[in-house]
């Protein structure tokens, strides 16, 4: 019998509570660029990407349907330095996240090498739970 670990596939689904929990419990290494996904409450999430050395104009964020894509293309220096040690990675990247149906991007900021993308879940009223009033008399015996 074979066991397949699907947790790497689940890490980029945002807005699905079970998948968010799997993310928090996952200890697997992340791909470039490193990122965090925060859940502040049931309807607010934040994706933070660490992009040291990138400039705001090097970045592009697109939302197509439920697919959120972040692309980065750093400016290449005219004279490439001769590195003795290069620990900071400056390479082009494209990172995609699949959002839940009712997730919206509410904003993005780039400060001190960190790109923050804020997400909000807007549940339609037909999906939101409804409160039912409890009466003393039966509605059938009116």
UniProtKB/Swiss-Prot annotation:
The keyword Cytoplasm applies. It comes from the Bacteria. Pfam families: HSP20. GO terms for biological process: protein stabilization. Keywords: Chaperone, Cytoplasm, Stress response. It is found in: Cytoplasm. CDD domains: ACD_IbpA-B_like. InterPro entries: A-crystallin/Hsp20_dom (IPR002068), ACD_IbpA/B (IPR037913), HSP20-like_chaperone (IPR008978), HSP20_IbpB (IPR022848). Signal peptide: none annotated. Residues 26-137 form the sHSP domain. PROSITE patterns: SHSP. PANTHER family: PTHR47062, SMALL HEAT SHOCK PROTEIN IBPB (PTHR47062:SF2). The N- and C-terminal flexible termini are involved in oligomerization and in the binding of non-native substrate proteins, and are essential for chaperone activity. NCBIfam families: PRK11597.1. Homodimer. Forms homomultimers of about 100-150 subunits at optimal growth temperatures. Conformation changes to oligomers at high temperatures or high ionic concentrations. The decrease in size of the multimers is accompanied by an increase in chaperone activity. Associates with aggregated proteins, together with IbpA, to stabilize and protect them from irreversible denaturation and extensive proteolysis during heat shock and oxidative stress. Aggregated proteins bound to the IbpAB complex are more efficiently refolded and reactivated by the ATP-dependent chaperone systems ClpB and DnaK/DnaJ/GrpE. Its activity is ATP-independent. Belongs to the small heat shock protein (HSP20) family. HAMAP family: HSP20_IbpB. This is Small heat shock protein IbpB. It comes from Salmonella typhimurium (strain LT2 / SGSC1412 / ATCC 700720).
